């Protein structure tokens, strides 16, 4: 499983994350952080950008499942990235919509999204718990990177060298 999330406050700083899970456990070596360049289109465009950048690394093994933190718009933009790399039908795609508490699966006909299957969260389900764990980890990792970028921009004089000299 690869889970993706975007963290931002406005459009100035946008951070993205990818966390990898293998056999139901986090695989730290598969974690990636992305500074998102796209400023137009919000989270859906950010998701598409980081997926395009990740999928361009053909030397990395593609996952069996991509989990998107977001609803229909984010998942549809992720689908566009899969389509560009010819991975529709080869890599499963799910959206994890927190507001509506639904798991979204695009229904694909002739390589296009024809509709959506929606499944309510089943908190007792082991499958749901695994998806939730992956989504929470992607969210945590994106937030952590966002804060790191924000601190560098807000407090540029307090880099690692200055901190090590005790001048903060």
Task: Please identify what each model-predicted range represents.
Residues 1-168:
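Acidic, glycine-enriched active-site microenvironments
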């Amino acid at each position: 499983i690869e889970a993706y999330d975007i963290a931002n406050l406005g459009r100035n700083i946008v951070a993205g994350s990818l966390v990898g899970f293998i056999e139901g456990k986090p695989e730290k070596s598969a974690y990636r952080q992305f500074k998102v360049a796209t400023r137009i289109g919000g989270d859906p465009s950010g998701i598409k950008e980081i997926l395009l950048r990740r999928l361009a690394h053909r030397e990395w093994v593609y996952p069996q499942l991509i989990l998107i933190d977001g609803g229909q718009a984010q998942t549809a933009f992720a689908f566009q990235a899969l389509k560009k790399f010819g991975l529709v039908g080869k890599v499963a795609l799910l959206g994890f919509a927190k507001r509506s508490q639904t798991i979204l699966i695009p229904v694909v006909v002739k390589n296009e999204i024809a509709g959506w299957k929606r499944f309510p969260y089943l908190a007792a389900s082991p499958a749901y718990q695994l998806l939730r764990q992956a989504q929470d980890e992607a969210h945590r990792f994106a937030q952590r990177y966002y804060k790191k970028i924000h601190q560098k921009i807000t407090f540029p004089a307090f880099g690692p060298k200055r901190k090590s000299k005790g001048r903060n």
